[in-house]
């Protein structure tokens, strides 16, 4: 398989040429001021997993640009590289590892066997263990150290052990039937743990410690914090804490834990929401039926991502459009704008997923690249964001592409009508209006009220945010990031940028540091 930099692709040169030739035909304000605008909106949609669709009508593209993007996908052999990943090739060159998060939700290609272990069977077995354990907890067969029924679960982890699972839980807590309340402790700031512990009944709470290596500094510090509080309250930690870790970590088969569920080195933290890292807390909170629907949606998204036709592959098209915006239009950021309060933490998860994966300046062979790579990712639910940072999005000097997410129905179903419309109708009216406002703008003699428009936007939409659609949404973005890494010739599955700060922090704590670092630390220690 040939792996090459973006600027070495003939198709990238063709894309640059096509954009230059088509620039006058790509102004969104003009596109939406024609008779064909309605047809464009309806036709520029691609099926995703669940009942979701990806609409790109408000992107500055036409047939010529799409043709050039298809050529880029073909030249970079994006689907073939995806197939290599699914078949167990060691795609993570930095750590010499396979990349198997898609295998946690379904098998699309060959069996992946490592050291005699069928990895799909391994993941299914861990899910079976989670199902049996969660059902035993819900039935009262497994009780607290004081013989009580568990009512709450707290996940202790950081990074991918927190952001993804927390975002998924919040996304479903109004929709799924709750069996236990879930909480999360991530920051080593003691106020984070103290706030959670002060809000729950410790005697009826189960704690999940999540650390693949079993050595994560912040997570182990929070574990000690939690254990000290439990012990002060006369509770047996061994009967109220379980571990999610790797089979080779110090936490594995450890009698200090009620039980252990296992992950492996082939699933990166930011890609671990469909592994035991996310499944354990979701199964305890909602039951295994919800987890299975979530995994089903993700598996469907993975399957659709195998299509070579970019007009029929939403994650591939989204990835290519993102590269077009980054490397042709020069956009340095992307805003994730879910018009769903349930997705309030989804932008934070995508921020880690995207920026930790593709925030690189060297290619997969360690050679510096000469082009821009991953954008800055940020976002906030609508309509809240409209009253916060949309001013810059509309009239700022930088053009920032927008990714809207919306649903026809609310999760709870409770709503009222006022001034001729329901709150849900008001929410979605604002979403639709924003897409057009960003695209078409508004001319005004008062320059302070003039909107240039031509702000690119996409829309992911569906009936409702349920477990299956959430899984499909997650898989869409995971696969989008993967494809972009392939296009830029990056290794999207390591994160060396996380390590340097950790190393220096240890030097501070051991008082073995250079003078400048010591001077900074003395402000705070």
UniProtKB/Swiss-Prot annotation:
An annotated GO cellular component: cytosol
Principal EC category: isomerase
Subcellular location: Cytoplasm
Annotated catalysed reactions: alpha-D-glucose 6-phosphate = beta-D-fructose 6-phosphate
Statement: the UniProt record of this protein carries the keyword Zinc: no
HAMAP family: G6P_isomerase (MF_00473)
NCBIfam families, sorted: PRK14095.1
Name under which the protein is recorded: Glucose-6-phosphate isomerase
Species, as recorded: Treponema denticola (strain ATCC 35405 / DSM 14222 / CIP 103919 / JCM 8153 / KCTC 15104)
